[in-house]
Swiss-Prot record:
This is Altered inheritance of mitochondria protein 23, mitochondrial. It is found in: Mitochondrion. The keyword Secreted does not apply. Residues 36-50, 75-91, 404-413 have a biased composition (Low complexity). InterPro entries: AIM23. Pfam families: mIF3. The gene is AIM23. Residues 386-403 have a biased composition (Basic residues). It comes from the Eukaryota. GO terms for cellular component: mitochondrion.
Amino acid sequence: MSLRIILKREFSQCIRVLESGSKSPTIANRFQAQYGNKNNNSKRNTANNGTGNGNRFHNKYNNESRRPYPKTKYQQQQQQQQQQRKPQQHQQYIIDPRKIKFDNGTESARNAIEEIINRVYQLQRNYQIQLITDSGLKKCHLSEILQKLDLSINGLQLIDKSTTTTATTTTPTTNTSDEDLPLIKIITVRDMINQYSTYLNNLKQLELIKLGSSKTLKTLDIKLKLEQKKSTTKEILMKWSINNNDFKLQKTNEIKKLINNNGGNGKSFLINMVYNKRNTNKPIDTIFKRRSNTEEDEQELIEIELQRRQLLIENLQSLLTELNCKWTIEGDINTKMTFNVTPKGQPTTIEPSTTTNIVDEEVEDYNNNNNDDDGDCDEKKMNRTERKKRKSEQQKQKQKQKQQSKTNTNSNTAKEEDLDALYSFKIED
């Protein structure tokens, strides 16, 4: 019983001590009461001063508040180069254009693309180019275009710059300036193959010239002469749909001016009769497909158009005969016709009938004055009357010919007007 009482007293004292320790931590935790104040004071000092008072080296060599030294020119150049290289870091992962393989397209198209890639490499080793677009020039890499290209439809064209061909063909460059970059344009595959074939032909001709073949030299001379003639020869473009009035007023004056400017020295010129400037070789069958609903209407329109074209050709031939010109015809009435015209001499502006009459009268008067003393008066009078009769008969014949020509021209104009009216009426229907 006594032990139980003692234990209960001690247990109750322990509980009291614990309750008093929870209320006052200084009494319960002597170590915290002794050493906790020192730690709190050190934290307060560091917060007030920013750094500990005891760390002299930290206060002496603190570089946060100090301004940096100014950079040298070399350091500035390095910084600029690093900034320029940052946007170009993705170029390291671009595919080499020579490693790109095309699944579509013919062998000739692939060979042409390979040739263009090699020529671009000779001009610019990093394959940086300028692409010609509708909005303008665009700087890009050649592989970006080749990956999106469909060889069955489109191709590429390398445009030579006249100012930089001599410098770039000999030594390849790696400059990224826009002026030195090669120009590339997207075109059709057919045009690319044609350009590639002409390029190969020129290479073969150069090889033959180096070997010393005379045939190639002759052919080149002939080609150069033909090109010079084409450049010098002038052309007159005439549409099939021209009216009769426009032909008489405009085109006749153009042809006469061209002959007068040449001076009638025999310089040839061309008259191209086409459907349109854009569609020069458009066939007559394809003109009326959209306009006519049935085949019969289409055939009627084609027949009317052929008659109009035939009359236009006849009028042009009659005009060339009046101007004393020779011509040769090439082409077809269904698509395109070219008149290669060469004038024989200078065009006559004054009518010959008036000049001949004046000269004949002067000669007759001179002869009559000289023969007054030798012949009889009756014979002179008879000769004069006969001559007057002949002159009057000749003048009457000329007037009849003029009237016939006028009637023919009027009939031709009436025919053309009728054909134009039929043509417009059919189109409206």
